[in-house]
Amino acid sequence: MASGLIDTNFSSTLANGMSGCDQSTVESLADDPTDSPFDADDCLKVRKYWCFLLSSIFTFLAGLLVVLLWRAFAFVCCRKEPDLGPNDPKQKEQKASRNKQEFEGTFMTEAKDWAGELISGQTTTGRILVVLVFILSIASLIIYFVDASSEEVERCQKWSNNITQQIDLAFNIFFMVYFFIRFIAASDKLWFMLEMYSFVDYFTIPPSFVSIYLDRTWIGLRFLRALRLMTVPDILQYLNVLKTSSSIRLAQLVSIFISVWLTAAGIIHLLENSGDPLDFNNAHRLSYWTCVYFLIVTMSTVGYGDVYCETVLGRTFLVFFLLVGLAMFASSIPEIIELVGSGNKYGGELKREHGKRHIVVCGHITYESVSHFLKDFLHEDREDVDVEVVFLHRKPPDLELEGLFKRHFTTVEFFQGTIMNPIDLQRVKVHEADACLVLANKYCQDPDAEDAANIMRVISIKNYSDDIRVIIQLMQYHNKAYLLNIPSWDWKQGDDVICLAELKLGFIAQSCLAPGFSTMMANLFAMRSFKTSPDMQSWTNDYLRGTGMEMYTETLSPTFIGIPFAQATELCFSKLKLLLLAIEIKGAEEGADSKISINPRGAKIQANTQGFFIAQSADEVKRAWFYCKACHEDIKDETLIKKCKCKNLTVQPRSKFDDLDEHHPAPTFTPPELPKRVHVRGSVSGDITRDREDTNLLNRNVRRPNGTGNGTGGMHHMNNTAAAAAAAAAAGKQVNKVKPTVNVSRQVEGQVISPSQYNRPTSRSSGTGTQNQNGGVSLPAGIADDQSKDFDFEKTEMKYDSTGMFHWSPAKSLEDCILDRNQAAMTVLNGHVVVCLFADPDSPLIGLRNLVMPLRASNFHYHELKHVVIVGSVDYIRREWKMLQNLPKISVLNGSPLSRADLRAVNVNLCDMCCILSAKVPSNDDPTLADKEAILASLNIKAMTFDDTIGVLSQRGPEFDNLSATAGSPIVLQRRGSVYGANVPMITELVNDSNVQFLDQDDDDDPDTELYLTQPFACGTAFAVSVLDSLMSTTYFNQNALTLIRSLITGGATPELELILAEGAGLRGGYSTVESLSNRDRCRVGQISLYDGPLAQFGECGKYGDLFVAALKSYGMLCIGLYRFRDTSSSCDASSKRYVITNPPDDFSLLPTDQVFVLMQFDPGLEYKPPAVRAPAGGRGTNTQGSGVGGGGSNKDDNS
């Protein structure tokens, strides 16, 4: 109804508007049979512009009036009637009226819905109509450009001869129909009448009809069609052309700017060419394009002055327009330039070169993390790295990071996007990538939130491509379970987790067994180049040479096939100058998983065996593949071993090392069944010769908790049970009635086989019985005899976890393991591990299980396990206890690591290692303060002094001095107690690398020095999680490298054990089986002293190469480096600090004070049995094995 009224009104308005116009010209033209042209000058003497203008105004006012009248009528006539009661007689009439209104309402609603669908962009018809309206609007605008190119504003021309007006009229008829459709679809008719696009129609449609009646044209306000350009962004979105916010914003800015510019130019053109009213005699002739030029120059505030407004109306409009136009120009143009300049800088799609691999790196992308990653990934020591590194991050790089990318532009590319968006994954071609690496923020405030974000990234990657290889960094060990439970996660396909907490604590744990080992391993998997200098100290040059060593893999040449591992290692070291650490042993069955075996006992090299080497570069390791006996046997210079032309590589030649088999006897396999045991106790004559044999026997079979055996090269092999029993009895007398449980031999088909065919040299100090200064009485490590009454060793059975890799005990409550200061002070702890833990009750869990588990590896005998004493907040430890309750020999002192009384109570001066850890979250305010507690604790211990009393400085008795004069005798096993805190073995965990300068007061480290070059790190007394950054690159290039490193530092954690722990139930105990007990027979880390014992001969001016060969042949131990005093002078102010030398050359001179890092075999030999009879009174001075380091539970070893 409203639309009909509008149509009628529109026609009447046109007629009424024309009634006042002069029709004489029109009539004369109509009467002219020849259709002669107008006399233009006579026609234009009378201006008719107001007719065109009034038609537009009247149309607007008429439409507005109709809408207002309709609303008033609806308000008066259609008011809501009051509800009538059910019995009211007018109710029927009301119902009929309502039904009629509902029918009309339904009809109007359907019409409105139809019109709405027709003009919306949601349907195909709507999209076509919207695009058609835009195209016709632009076509009408082009017609205006054509008409406005002349300087005439009003022109007399017969309509039938005016082609442009005829075309424009056809367009306007279409716009009029579209106007009515929009009017019907509008929910608020009054507001619709006041819309901008409605005014465009008011001032463009009616004048086209007026021109027919007057036979003249007025340029008028047709330039308003330019405002239709503002709909370009909407139309492009309807057509799915614009999808990103930046492109939509750019289209909006450009369309608004151009629309306003062209519209304002049309107004200036109209006003200047018309002149000022009322006589219009000062017209300023300007073309439309000149006006366009004039406006852009004016808006940009340049204003050349070559074009300007002369009319009053033109100038007035310009004044007001500049207030808007200048602001728009100043805001829009910079934003447009920014969007155009940066829109596609890091967008687009990866263009892969044919045959070139690429990896995608995401997660925590900053200058620091990226620079560390690229420094290691693109290191020159690697073989030609033909891999492109693609970084994907949601934020654009800052200037520093952008500069880094430019310096590596040939191998690095950055894309802006998120790993959670499949479109961005498609852009960087994740499905074609070689691997996807996820970096973590090591300094984050919330480690669990950081891990959750990275795990979600892995889920997104695996959801997009489930066969892509993923290597991820995680902060917390307990979050590893969520990752392992992802269905498409498969470690067999190369997926790997680098858990920073697990590896960090594992490195620290191994340093408890062999101080300095954390530094050695960290340097091995980091790619570094070393440069020695004569200006530097000798110890610095020795250390730097070791930092240049890395771990590589290479396939062994056919020359090695069939020879034992020890023999192959000797050949590599002496001939190729390579250190062979481990080999990959393939499964016996086809398709079975291969495993990495470190220093395997009795394994022989098979064809295509992959070896793990320590060397300076990948080129050096190639010698292992190039080596050929026929071509290279006589070559003395290892650098000359190159690829030969020998074709007979398939035939295995007999190596000159084959005659060494007699020096490498096959190791004895220890059966899992219960062995025969000999319990002997008695008195034997004490001549010195027999005592020497007894001491050798005891120390050969009672190994230290630090991980090495105690036998000597000169000891006698026991050939029968009786001799062994007598010797054990004498040993029992020697060590204060300690009753050993001896497994001297086992019977196999009537023959007696010795427990281990490798002799055992003594290792670094530890906690079992040694001589003290009072008459050679033993001072075993552990708890005093009066503290051991609660432990019944005969009735307790020792168990392992279900995999057989770790010692296990039934769950203990935390309260049973808590000591107060008095209880700790009454406990003579020795050879133990003190963990100084700084934590608040709500601090994030760091996973203390990862520190204790390597110290509970099953390749230690039970009595060798070091007691772990944790000093810290018991409220925090209670949260960790669920993961510690099944691990034996743990005590907790609820105290402060900064309290000297607490430190004295736990005998920190007698410990084998003091670990200083912090679980507190670093502050954002000042990151350097994150390590304040750890540094204070370290300096506090170094400033302490201790009494030189019994049990502090253990000295050798005279009888022992006589024994040690022979080649076969052991060294003093117990670490001498420290009188000064500076000599306490210590390792401090740091969050910030730069804080390492505060640990040692006697060094001259520069704050800008890299961590690995600082003295505390070189000495193995500091460790920071940043050194683990290199593992990402190492794991990518060598899938087995992380497995090897994890095996070395975790004590034997396997993927199967990881899956068990991922269940969340913790370690599960298991019955010993043949398979699980065989897992005990694996290599471990140890430290051997050259001061005394069977290897002492090499300490006096010996060479490292001779030591290496002798240790490998005689004891099956693989030497990997030295731990040497920094100051080798005997001056009184010489430092007691040692530093790490990784894999010295074979001609390297040794010193008696050196300690050797070794990978030693498992010793299944004689077990140690604590006494059943209490020691005589004297108590703490004659401490026996208790629940301290050597006691606390069962020590019955079913596999000995």
From Swiss-Prot:
Subcellular location: Membrane
UniProtKB keywords: Calcium, Ion channel, Ion transport, Membrane, Phosphoprotein, Potassium, Potassium channel, Potassium transport, Transmembrane, Transmembrane helix, Transport, Voltage-gated channel
Residue spans of biased composition, Polar residues class: 746-776
Entry-linked InterPro entries: Ion_trans_dom, K_chnl_BK_asu, K_chnl_Slo-like, NAD(P)-bd_dom_sf, RCK_N, Slowpoke-like_C
Residue positions, PTM Phosphoserine: S978
Ranges that cross the membrane: 49-69, 128-149, 165-185, 190-210, 215-235, 251-271, 317-337
UniProt PTM: Phosphorylated. Phosphorylation may be mediated by both PKA and SRC kinases, which activate the channel activity. Phosphorylation by PKA is however unclear. Indeed, although modulation of channel activity requires Pka-C1, it does not interact with the whole PKA holoenzyme. Moreover, modulation of activity does not depend upon phosphorylation of Ser-978.
Residue ranges of the motif Calcium bowl: 988-1010
Residue intervals annotated with topology Extracellular: 1-48, 150-164, 211-214, 272-284, 308-316
Cytoplasmic compartment spans: 70-127, 186-189, 236-250, 338-1200
Highest taxon of the lineage: Eukaryota
Pfam families hit by this protein: BK_channel_a, Ion_trans, Slo-like_RCK, Slowpoke_C
Motif extent (Selectivity for potassium): 301-304
Gene Ontology cellular component list: membrane; monoatomic ion channel complex; neuron projection; neuronal cell body; plasma membrane; postsynaptic membrane
Region: Segment S8, residue numbers: 563-583
Function noted in UniProt: Potassium channel activated by both membrane depolarization or increase in cytosolic Ca(2+) that mediates export of K(+). Its activation dampens the excitatory events that elevate the cytosolic Ca(2+) concentration and/or depolarize the cell membrane. It therefore contributes to repolarization of the membrane potential. Kinetics are determined by alternative splicing, phosphorylation status and its combination interaction with Slob and 14-3-3-zeta. While the interaction with Slob1 alone increases its activity, its interaction with both Slob1 and 14-3-3-zeta decreases its activity.
Entry note about domains: The S4 segment, which is characterized by a series of positively charged amino acids at every third position, is part of the voltage-sensor. The pore-forming domain (also referred as P region) is imbedded into the membrane, and forms the selectivity filter of the pore. It contains the signature sequence of potassium channels that displays selectivity to potassium.
Family the entry assigns: Belongs to the potassium channel family. Calcium-activated (TC 1.A.1.3) subfamily. Slo sub-subfamily.
Oligomeric form and interacting partners: Homotetramer; which constitutes the calcium-activated potassium channel. Interacts with Slip1. Interacts with Slob, and, indirectly with 14-3-3-zeta via its interaction with Slob. Interacts with Pka-C1 and Src kinases, which can bind simultaneously to it.
Designated name of the protein: Calcium-activated potassium channel slowpoke
Source taxonomy: Eukaryota, Metazoa, Ecdysozoa, Arthropoda, Hexapoda
